[in-house]
Regions:
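Switch/communication elements of ASCE P-loop NTPase nucleotide-binding domains
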Residues: 22-158
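Acidic, Mg2+-coordinating catalytic modules of nucleic-acid enzymes
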Residues: 155-170, 174-329
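Alpha-helical coupling/stalk and coiled-coil linker elements that connect catalytic or binding modules
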Residues: 1-31, 63
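Generic structural motif
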Residues: 3-7, 134-135, 296
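Short, well-ordered loop/turn elements at secondary-structure boundaries
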Residues: 17, 40-41, 64-65, 100-101, ...
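Structured core elements
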Residues: 20-22, 33-36, 70, 77, ...
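Short alpha-helical segments and helix-capping/turn motifs at coil-helix boundaries
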Residues: 3-7, 31, 107-109, 213-217
């Protein structure tokens, strides 16, 4: 019996096994191996090659059709700054590598990418029991230009979590923003969410600090998106519209959202500028505090008194803790 040796050399394997990709900084002149890059950078470089290949195929195809490019969740393994840069630079990069206009569809769950995009180019998709709801933010902007200008500026400067939340809680200020999450956890421990299967702490809700003066501007927007919302705001009692007052002596409110809400409940025209009576605010029923999927809450009387703000209401129901005497009723 004779033994033979067959050598199999494949040029593809030789190149793959013996070649190392490096990155060189033009100014420093220092080369680093690709292993020094994170997965986010590697994915970004891979996408660059895929896009270049896609562009080349379009040039060779010579068809009259508009080429479509779908990029699904590019934020995977990218840090926020990289997501922002990628979303902003994508169209510029495509215009550099191709003379043909490429219509791009980019799907994402990233608030950073949504924050980079022009609102008129955003299409909101929501899965419901009846199917997928698809909404054009550009259409909302045309119908509500004033609201859209404010929402666009606010979300751009703060956060776009609203697009990816199952529900949203709008709060008055920093106190509510800090206390509400803790209150939700304590309510859960006390069993106040029972018998709900998926309790609020396990749901994806967005907590957005917006202030009582502007929360009403978001109401048409969340109604358009179909997102349930809760507004927690201050009653802000006033004597005559200019002078602050304790609730028991107040005549109206300075809170624009509450005034907007009462006008909606009473069916008053938007042009109506008459003062909203504090009595009408206090007497709102639970049903009247709900419009579609939006609900509003503010301070109510406890221990014979009604606080003007959340801070006053907390002190009122914890008088012993704060060393306050019992209220005179």
């Amino acid at each position: 019996m004779q033994l033979g040796v067959n050598t199999k050399l494949q040029i593809d394997n030789q190149i793959k096994d013996q070649t190392e990709l490096t990155y060189t900084a033009p100014l420093a002149g220092e080369a680093l191996p690709s292993s020094h890059n994170g997965l986010g950078y590697k994915n970004l470089i891979k996408m660059e090659f895929l896009l270049a290949d896609f562009s080349e195929k379009i040039k060779q195809d010579h068809t009259a059709c508009i080429p479509l490019l779908f990029v699904e969740e590019p934020e995977s393994h990218m840090h926020p700054q990289m997501q922002h840069t990628f979303a902003g630079y994508l169209q510029t990069f495509l215009s550099k590598i191709s003379d043909v206009h490429i219509q791009t569809f980019l799907t994402s769950h990233s608030a950073h990418i949504a924050n980079t995009m022009d609102f008129s180019n955003i299409r909101y998709a929501q899965k419901t029991k009846r199917g997928v709801v698809y909404k054009d933010l550009g259409a909302f902007g045309e119908e509500n230009p004033e609201n859209m200008d404010f929402i666009k500026k606010y979300l751009t400067l703060s956060r776009c979590d609203l697009f990816f939340a199952d529900k949203v809680i709008f709060v008055e200020g920093a106190s509510e923003r800090l206390l509400v999450p803790d209150m939700i956890e304590k309510c859960d421990k006390l069993g106040l969410f029972a018998p709900i299967t998926y309790k609020l702490p396990a749901q994806y809700y967005a907590l957005i600090e917006i202030g009582g003066a502007y929360a009403y501007k978001f109401i048409p927007f969340v109604r358009f998106l179909g997102i349930p919302c809760l507004i927690i705001t201050d009653i802000d009692a006033m004597k005559d519209g200019r002078t602050k007052s304790v609730v028991s002596k107040g005549k109206t409110t300075s809170n624009s959202t509450i005034k907007w809400w009462v006008r909606q409940v009473k069916g008053l025209p938007s042009a109506d500028k008459s003062k909203i009576k504090l009595e009408d605010i206090i007497n709102l029923t639970a049903d009247e505090k709900t419009i579609d999927k939006c609900h509003i809450e503010f301070q109510v009387a406890e221990n014979g008194l009604c606080g003007r703000s959340l801070e006053e209401a907390i002190k009122n129901v914890n008088r012993a803790f704060y060393g306050l005497a019992d209220p005179v009723t």
